[in-house]
């Protein structure tokens, strides 16, 4: 009886206790979050940065090794930055094709913000109206196939001087790396800035200093909330100082172009043709852009930065590695030389069509870019929350596509570490990341694919064709081996300059 009388009270009290407990637990227990991609264990504060503490290891090799343990889509915590690394063609295709719009942004990098005049360029500007207008300028005005062909005389002239310089070595060892770098810089400068007078050597040295200071991963980008790092690192002060000197030169070059256009109505390029600055000035004056998109000197300089920094470095690095690989694989060099010398035999002057018909040389270039992509990573940033392979990718996540690792993936490339151009003989000469080429796309894919592919490849093709046509090559000091070590950094360059002895074929 006593039990019956107290039962309702006990029931009510128990119910209230349970209800309150559930409410408290709901508040305390974190909401279930969608799963991020798997990844290695993390340390407090620094996350996965300890994975990169190595004197000799290259970052893209470290990420390749981590991906072999954790999968082709991997999450890393880089200080305060949440990052995802894609290491397979399948994952890369989703990011650059299937979900291209969701990943159309580029990560914010403080050094790049400075050198591009607050992201007024195309390579690092966020996806939006301004970016679309600038890309349209590149694709429809600056680097159309017709425009690239119009630069032939400048390329021909500069490479002719290169051949003369190498001939003058008279069988002595030359630093081919420096010669090629200087040559590609000269081509880019003539195409972009024309023949107006300016301090060319000083300008290119400043560009080199700027790229060195701005390159690599900076602590300020990994710990953006720690303002003290901005002061202690000192990079920004150095960049502003260098950029101030570059500004003076470029402003003078742009003013010279304006005056020449007004005075003569002609461009400042080869034989009165328009160069890049001339075209950009006409766009500025022609009112072709929407009225809400300002376009002045800083916009022009930012676009020039993309062309000068991207064009010369990409081409020279590719040529350097192609010659290195052919020295390591003499049978490849012999086969390429045979093709070129048969095609050019008896010709006093080489034209662009002659170069375009060199199929084996193109296979050599494809194989070089597979093993040695000039940029080891493609960088993106998630602008819309989405899922990849069942994993959640939050807005703002930095994305790194490991192109270097993709090119050496044994699942897609038999004998991946071997230099075998023949593997590309039945694969179209295509670097757009299309279906048949997704196992490697060194120039990107989708909306943010490099708009200067045809221009860069034209420089690489002509340079290699002339080097292999005019000269036989050997290593200095009867060396039997060539050091192929890569430089530490995010770009896959040679660590040591390539020194070779040329002998005139003719």
Curated annotation (Swiss-Prot):
Pathway: Alkaloid biosynthesis. Heme binds at residue 450. The chain crosses the membrane at residues 5-25. It catalyses: (+)-vincadifformine + reduced [NADPH--hemoprotein reductase] + O2 = (+)-minovincinine + oxidized [NADPH--hemoprotein reductase] + H2O + H(+). Its cofactor is heme. It is a single-pass membrane protein. The enantiomer (-)-vincadifformine acts as a competitive inhibitor. GO terms for cellular component: endoplasmic reticulum membrane. Keywords: Alkaloid metabolism, Endoplasmic reticulum, Heme, Iron, Membrane, Metal-binding, Monooxygenase, Oxidoreductase, Transmembrane, Transmembrane helix. Residues 1-4 are lumenal. It is found in: Endoplasmic reticulum membrane. GO terms for biological process: indole alkaloid biosynthetic process. Changing residue 376 to P: Normal (+)-vincadifformine 19-hydroxylase activity. Normal (+)-vincadifformine 19-hydroxylase activity. Changing residue 312 to T: Normal (+)-vincadifformine 19-hydroxylase activity. Acquired tabersonine 3-oxidase (T3O) activity converting (-)-tabersonine to tabersonine 2,3-epoxide in addicition to native (+)-vincadifformine 19-hydroxylase activity. Its main location: endoplasmic reticulum. Accumulates progressively in roots. Residues 26-506 are cytoplasmic. Pfam families: p450. Its EC number is 1.14.14.-. PANTHER family: OS06G0641600 PROTEIN (PTHR47953:SF19), OS08G0105600 PROTEIN (PTHR47953). Belongs to the cytochrome P450 family. Component of the monoterpenoid indole alkaloids (MIAs, e.g. echitovenine, tabersonine, lochnericine, 19-hydroxytabersonine and horhammericine) biosynthetic pathway; MIAs are used in cancer treatment and other medical applications. Cytochrome P450 catalyzing the hydroxylation of (+)-vincadifformine to (+)-minovincinine. This is (+)-vincadifformine 19-hydroxylase. It comes from Catharanthus roseus (Madagascar periwinkle). The gene is V19H.
